[in-house]
Amino acid sequence: MGKKQKNKSEDSTKDDTDLGALAAEIEGAGAAKEQEPQKGKGKKKKEKKKQDFDENDILRELEELSLEAQGIGADRDAATVKPTENNEEESASKQDKKKKGQKGKKTSFDENDSEELEDKDSKSKKPARPNSEVLLSGSEDADDPNKLSKKGKKAQKSTKKRDGSEEDEDNSKRSKERSRVNSSGESGGESDEFLQSRKGQKKNQKNKSVPTIDSGNEDDDSSFKIKTVAQKKAEKKERERKKREEEKAKLRKVKEKEELEKGRKEQSKQREPQKRPDEEVLVLRGTPDAGAASEEKGDIAATLEDDNEGDKKKKDKKKKKTEKDDKEKEKKKGPSKSTVKAIQEALAKLREEEERQKREEEERIKRLEELEAKRKEEERLEQEKRERKKQKEKERKERLKKEGKLLTKSQREARARAEVTLRHLQAQGVEVPSKDSLPKKRPVYEDKKKKKTPQQLESKEALETVEVSAPVEVVDQGVPEKEETPPSVDAEEDEETEDAGLDDWEAMASDEEREKEGNMIHIEVEENPEEEEEEEEDEDEEDSEDEEDEGDSEGSDGDEEDYKLSDEKDLGKAGDTKPNKDASSDSEYDSDDDRTKEERAYDKAKRRIEKRRLEHGKNVNTEKLRAPIICVLGHVDTGKTKILDKLRHTHVQDGEAGGITQQIGATNVPLEAINEQTKMIKNFDRENVRIPGMLIIDTPGHESFSNLRNRGSSLCDIAILVVDIMHGLEPQTIESINILKSKKCPFIVALNKIDRLYDWKKSPDSDVAVTLKKQKKNTKDEFEERAKAIIVEFAQQGLNAALFYENKDPRTFVSLVPTSAHTGDGMGSLIYLLVELTQTMLSKRLAHCEELRAQVMEVKALPGMGTTIDVILINGRLKEGDTIIVPGVEGPIVTQIRGLLLPPPMKELRVKNQYEKHKEVEAAQGVKILGKDLEKTLAGLPLLVAYKDDEIPVLKDELIHELKQTLNAIKLEEKGVYVQASTLGSLEALLEFLKTSEVPYAGINIGPVHKKDVMKASVMLEHDPQYAVILAFDVRIERDAQEMADSLGVRIFSAEIIYHLFDAFTKYRQDYKKQKQEEFKHIAVFPCKMKILPQYIFNSRDPIVIGVTVEAGQVKQGTPMCVPSKNFVDIGIVTSIEINHKQVDVAKKGQEVCVKIEPIPGESPKMFGRHFEATDILVSKISRQSIDALKDWFRDEMQKSDWQLIVELKKVFEII
């Protein structure tokens, strides 16, 4: 029977392993190759299990031995334990094999297959019930005397079989449990659970094994008493012999019945193809238990019918053999299509599940990243908000500091005391001056306190604490919503008239607020301010209600934040004050209230300005166009001003100093002049001209005036680039092109001076294209050649150019208009082209807009008018009396327009004319503005108009930002010349020249030279007399200033042309330098090193005449010489130098010369051969004074090697 049991267990393990290998084959994995190492692992585990089990059993047996105290009982127990141990070895091997099979399945099957296997396990458990019956039957056999009369061998076999069947049952249970664990898919905790189940099984096994052994002992005791060792060995040999015989018989019968069973099984397969996979799994799962049950039944039958035992065994063997063969065949054939399909579906589901999990994980990570990014963005915004808040608070404090309204605690207390005194005086009947004469400030000591009764104060206490505390809470939470809007300065004007009605408003508000009191938030302040807090909050409420009466509903987040901040500060300040000082708290709050009101007024004005600009931007009228601003640019002497003179019929160029434009000028060309100038153009539609005129700006062409060219081009809508047809593109022309490119300003080119072409015949009353056709062939050829050359030069600058009458695409190609400012040819075509381009291509830019846009061009001092500013009004309108803010050297200047002067039409703005005074001016115009405090105005920056007083600080701040950049350009030095010019533009040009010439400037001014300017310049006489100079450009010098300058020794250089001024100053510097060189000639000692030529000693004493080689430096007449190697002995002064019998002033390095050295007056003459030898080196005797003189006045005559020699000699002479 043991043999049968072994065969069954081997079959079941083989089935398991084969199925696992089959699943691995379907997936394409080589599971079969991995089975051998797995078996090895299983053996190791089996040995380990066996050792554990043996140790436990030995402990148990020792306990039984101590109880029984009989050697026979111990022998019996040992005899019964051995078969159990053998059975355990077999079960352990089965478990290992099953484990291998289940591992293979786990890799191939998914969760769905595991569920199916669990169902089959539950079915296979049912046949395990007969174990209990076997035990019962065993006990019956023990009691029955007939059965006891059987041979001892049979009894021993039956007991062994029973023990083996119990062991098989336990093993089958373990394998089922393991299969459940594996099929559950919990891979993470699989090994832990398996170990725990193993431990539990061992415990159960111990508990079960004890009673079976005892029952076996009882049976043995009832059948016989003692077995010798020889008997046991004989029984064992008999059992082994019988097993071998049975195996041989089995093999024979298997071969006989193989063919017959094949046919039967094939038929059954054909009948039931669908049931085969299930049966296969059932067989695989059920073989251990079913085999155990059948074995037990066979054992019972063997004990009952000993005669028929052999036949039954044969039948059982045949039956099991056939079953085994069938299973092997089925496995060889492989799984059915349905099984393969099920496995493939399971694999597909597994892959889908993995993909789904992967997608979910990616989505989760993406969500987390988005949340993190959102959090960071919120943190950044919060940080920015805090920084803005801090910056705003800082700016507000700075502004109040500048205005003198940021009071310290001591100042507030002093102010409070003064107000208390005033109140007492007023109560005594003394007349106190009204606050109308003082700066605007709301009177705190008047009606408000007198009108309020104690009942009203009590009723307001709850209301105000709630009203003020709630906004504080809102600030803490960072919620921007707030009902009250910031008050404005305008509210102050109507305050006195509204004070009477305010109490009613407050009473109404207090009634409404009492109803809502439950919903409001209240915050307690640490120190409880009593009446001061109420009074302060009353004022806050009145301010807000004043605003509500006015109907001002504008608001922004930033303003609300400031308002909340101010409320919070008010609370804090109220908490700090002492309760017994009513008057001091009132006045203290008054100053705080003024400050917060100003802040609110500032924000309100800012919003108003922005709103106005926005509205003006929307209300642009494209039908009505303003006059285009046209800028004239070009190189020196190309004829810019001459072209304008021809257009205006003026002679501005003749009146200019040296014919050079040194200021920016503006000319208004009216529509009538345009029509007059373009009458010779046939295809010009004069009736449909939409522009009201043109404003032409003339800029200087000289290199020094690049700042003015830049300023002029920044204003213009379209530019005229004047090019001399005889010279092409010149340096300032290219600079102008680059300026226009950077500003993205459209332009047309005037090819001027065509009258210089040989044989040119003028025809100013006809179109220039027609005039060109009338010219001789040689003139036309020359023109075409020069025009093509200029087109090529433009191409080199990256611009396409074409003659205007050949240009089909004005947007891509720059138009070239041939002109002659001298004869007037091409002037009409130039104006026609300007009009056409501006009203078609630039119509949106020229659309009429009410928003003011103006730029300060020049600052000029005029006799009888004071300092005036020339302004280009680009958009909007200016009125007399408007408050304007203009940039100044020391900050923005606020002043009122006292006069608006316009030159007559077709007249230059900068040229002194009979100006026409206007009350109102519309764009676009060149306007001269009269006003106070314009001396320090900076040109090149915008002019702004404040329509209300509260807008002034806002506009000032706007200008400050732009002002910083311009002011950085003008940096004064401690030592330098004093520069004075008529306009800021020319002053900038002069300063630029001084910078390039490395001439420092210590002071600047605009306007005529006065005594104060001479005083400032005379300061330099003490520091550095060479800089005690005034450079006056295009300004008048007062007579008393000139006299003072002569007496103090200050030089004033004056010129109307900037280059003449440069030349005069340069000449002065050179003369001054020569004068100083002559003065320091005897102090300055040039360094030299000479070697004596011993064969050329002409005279050894008084004077020493010797031939020398100049090794380093330079030898000059008057250089004192000494010999360092002979204790620095002074041998005399060089009085004469000769080369080839010719006298020279200087001998340079490398020359061989003859020098005459005369002794120093008053000293004994030195002698060659006694005081110094031919081997000694002669050097010039330098000192600190001589080195300084060289640095200051002889630097140009020194070379780098000379300075190196000075460094060397300084060490020799130990000069610091």
Curated annotation (Swiss-Prot):
The modification Phosphothreonine is found at residues 107, 497. Residues 820-822 are annotated as: G5. Residues 659-663 are annotated as: G2. Its main location: cytoplasm. Residues 96-106, 148-160 have a biased composition (Basic residues). It catalyses: GTP + H2O = GDP + phosphate + H(+). InterPro entries: EFTU-type (IPR029459), P-loop_NTPase (IPR027417), Small_GTP-bd (IPR005225), T_Tr_GTP-bd_dom (IPR000795), TIF_IF2 (IPR015760), TIF_IF2_dom3 (IPR023115), TIF_IF2_dom3_sf (IPR036925), Transl_B-barrel_sf (IPR009000). GO terms for biological process: regulation of translational initiation; ribosome assembly; translational initiation. Residues 19-32 have a biased composition (Low complexity). Pfam families: GTP_EFTU, GTP_EFTU_D4, IF-2. GTP binds at residues 636-642, 659-661, 752-753, 755-756, 821-822. Signal peptide: none annotated. Residues 625-842 form the tr-type G domain. Residues 1-604 are annotated as: Disordered. Disulfide bonds: none annotated. Plays a role in translation initiation. Ribosome-dependent GTPase that promotes the joining of the 60S ribosomal subunit to the pre-initiation complex to form the 80S initiation complex with the initiator methionine-tRNA in the P-site base paired to the start codon. Together with eIF1A (EIF1AX), actively orients the initiator methionine-tRNA in a conformation that allows 60S ribosomal subunit joining to form the 80S initiation complex. Is released after formation of the 80S initiation complex. This is Eukaryotic translation initiation factor 5B.
